[in-house]
Amino acid sequence: MEAPPPPPPLPATTLAPGRSRKLLLLPLLLFLLRAEAVRGFEAEERPRTREEECHFYAGGQVYPGEVSRVSVAEHSLHLSKAKISKPAPYWEGTAVINGEFKELKLTDYRGKYLVFFFYPLDFTFVCPTEIIAFGDRIDEFRSINTEVVACSVDSQFTHLAWINTPRRQGGLGSINIPLLADLNHQISKDYGVYLEDSGHTLRGLFIIDDKGILRQITLNDLPVGRSVDETLRLVQAFQYTDKHGEVCPAGWKPGSETIIPDPAGKLKYFDKLN
């Protein structure tokens, strides 16, 4: 008995080279997508470490080099109304002054220089060091007709609770400068320091002169505090130029040489310098 003939061969199908490569890559792509989804799920489910909780409590990642840090391009800063050599944006609100709630406004300081600075949040880390440093040296500012006001997006009630917390526990204790509440964020937005994505401000510092004109702006990223010595120096320099009409070179301090702002005057300065 003869064996049955073999079945006819199936017609060959030829895939285009491009389509063939796509089909080969499809399982790999599906695997990578599934792995990414699992990692994302695990990240959401994993409890925060103590360090991460501190960062979250402070309003975001605040140390250099962190991969999860929000990039500058993703920050949403409001258009600032604060312009150098123009009237400072008006503000008013409730502040804690000597343990009491009082209404405070920018015009209360007309006739004096004002150091007006923003800090991110109460009960954090760098912020109390700045407020205490300025508060402990308020007499040096007042001796040159200058006042200091600190502001954050916290309420006056949170401010008071922080003041009533001992310094050894991270509180402020008794302080000599007002803490202004900006609960609706309007002041922070007007001064261009409010981070919409984080819900708090950058470390902004503004020097306003005795006529209400904005003379200086400093904006620090979150991890680094500001210098009381440098702020005092800047106020003294602006006051000197207001009174004498001369200009202050780099690093100028009271008693140092200044420059008469004309061609002959500058030559006298550079001749002494060199």
Swiss-Prot record:
Record EC number: 1.11.1.24
Molecular function, one GO term: thioredoxin peroxidase activity
Keyword Glycoprotein: no
Major subcellular location class: cytoplasm
One cellular component term from this protein's GO annotations in UniProt: endoplasmic reticulum
GO BP annotations listed: cell redox homeostasis; hydrogen peroxide catabolic process; response to oxidative stress
Cellular localization per UniProt: Cytoplasm; Endoplasmic reticulum
Matching Pfam families: 1-cysPrx_C (PF10417), AhpC-TSA (PF00578)
Recorded catalytic activity of this chain's protein: a hydroperoxide + [thioredoxin]-dithiol = an alcohol + [thioredoxin]-disulfide + H2O
Main function: Thiol-specific peroxidase that catalyzes the reduction of hydrogen peroxide and organic hydroperoxides to water and alcohols, respectively. Plays a role in cell protection against oxidative stress by detoxifying peroxides and as sensor of hydrogen peroxide-mediated signaling events. Regulates the activation of NF-kappa-B in the cytosol by a modulation of I-kappa-B-alpha phosphorylation.
Family note: Belongs to the peroxiredoxin family. AhpC/Prx1 subfamily.
Extra remark: The active site is a conserved redox-active cysteine residue, the peroxidatic cysteine (C(P)), which makes the nucleophilic attack on the peroxide substrate. The peroxide oxidizes the C(P)-SH to cysteine sulfenic acid (C(P)-SOH), which then reacts with another cysteine residue, the resolving cysteine (C(R)), to form a disulfide bridge. The disulfide is subsequently reduced by an appropriate electron donor to complete the catalytic cycle. In this typical 2-Cys peroxiredoxin, C(R) is provided by the other dimeric subunit to form an intersubunit disulfide.
Protein name, per record: Peroxiredoxin-4
